[in-house]
Amino acid sequence: MLSIKFINDNRDYVRKALENRNFDVSVFDTLLSYLDKRGAAMHDAQIKRSELSKLSRQIGSFKDDKAKMNELKLQAANLKKDVVELEKNADEFDQKAYEIIISIPNISLDSVPVGKDENDNQVINTHDNLGRKLVSNVLPHYEIGNKLDIFDFERAVKLSGSRFVVFKGAGAKLARALQNFMLDLHTANGYKEYSVPVLVKPEILFGTGQLPKFKDDLFFMEQTNMYLIPTAEVPLTNLYNNEIIDLSQPVRLTGFTECFRSEAGSGGKDMKGIIRSHQFKKVELVKITSEEDWEFEFKQMLEQAKLVLEELELPYRELQLCTGDLGFSSRTTVDLEVWLPSELKYREISSVSYMGDFQARRAMIRYRDDNNEVKFTHTMNGSGLAIDRLIAAILENYQNSDGTVSIPKKLIPYFGSDKIAY
């Protein structure tokens, strides 16, 4: 959430930044109108209060002149009514302004390329890490998975409908191996592991920016007034909701959760396989830092997410998102996309995003600086990584000509064998 002071002090800058993010600037202009009216009402109320204070002092000097005293008392009563009315108006404009402010996305860093949509994203680097030769005619992950009997889509439909998957046998084992491998990798590099609830209160999703704007993308449990989390970013960041925390060292968190998304608006995209499911597995990385530390910590988080792909020897690329493709809460985002040879294209497997103090303002996460001044923290998060898509990438990039799938070397100790066979 942007601060009112920042908006008022940088109106032209914010307007242009929102325009670059494809935000309807007429809504922003309405916000400015409400802020101006709120400011005017508060200013007028202050003038009336000053007049009332002056009048109250005068009343005492007319004790012997009841007519004059009554006249002044009447004026004072009218001034009080004016103050109450002006303060009421200010509160109404303040509420209207707030309702718009919580719908306004974050302001991108000046270094983020201006663009309309995903077509304007910029490739930073491409990493051809695969230490083996691909077989010809690579089967899609869902076909090789069915042949190896590690998925059961039919029974998933029976249980829950479309966009769900049952992992079984070596498939379930591979998912568990990846989870443990990534958590070990992250905790060895300074992240503290957490196991968190997947059901959270509405105010928790507000804190990280999913509510109210993305309500339709979430699964709501009406009987409990709670939501299933779309990512562990939500509970991990909000562990410190409404707290003043010690930031003598940056807070570094990791955790595995099931994640849930309604995929509203995705239409018929990716109906086959495990690329886009209502429920999926993911290991998340979250950091809470000071403003001074964010850049170093962001670069380190990106390297940590990349390390998973490097260790698994999977080909991938880094993509700097443009202004028009940034997430709601993000100031800058680098996507990591893994190569899927059956599709001859890269697929997102991680988004590493820096949020500034945008989420901290919504969630009221604060710290004391060296001068004991209370400030909002800065937050960042990234997938570390999405397990279902990792499985798809391994099944395609590690296929063998005999129909088996090799296991990446670093994963073998976790999986217990070097391949998945019939």
Curated annotation (Swiss-Prot):
The lineage of its organism: Bacteria, Bacillati, Mycoplasmatota, Mycoplasmoidales, Metamycoplasmataceae. ATP binds at R261, S262, E263, E348, I349, S350, S351. This is Serine--tRNA ligase. It catalyses: tRNA(Ser) + L-serine + ATP = L-seryl-tRNA(Ser) + AMP + diphosphate + H(+); tRNA(Sec) + L-serine + ATP = L-seryl-tRNA(Sec) + AMP + diphosphate + H(+). Keywords: Aminoacyl-tRNA synthetase, ATP-binding, Cytoplasm, Ligase, Nucleotide-binding, Protein biosynthesis. Homodimer. The tRNA molecule binds across the dimer. The keyword Nucleotide-binding applies. The keyword Protein biosynthesis applies. InterPro entries: aa-tRNA-synt_IIb, aa-tRNA-synth_II, aa-tRNA-synth_II/BPL/LPL, Ser-tRNA-ligase_type_1, Ser-tRNA-synth_1_N, SerRS_1_N_sf, SerRS_core, tRNA-bd_arm. It comes from Mycoplasmopsis agalactiae (strain NCTC 10123 / CIP 59.7 / PG2). GO terms for biological process: selenocysteine biosynthetic process; seryl-tRNA aminoacylation. Consists of two distinct domains, a catalytic core and a N-terminal extension that is involved in tRNA binding. GO terms for cellular component: cytoplasm. It comes from the Bacteria. Belongs to the class-II aminoacyl-tRNA synthetase family. Type-1 seryl-tRNA synthetase subfamily.
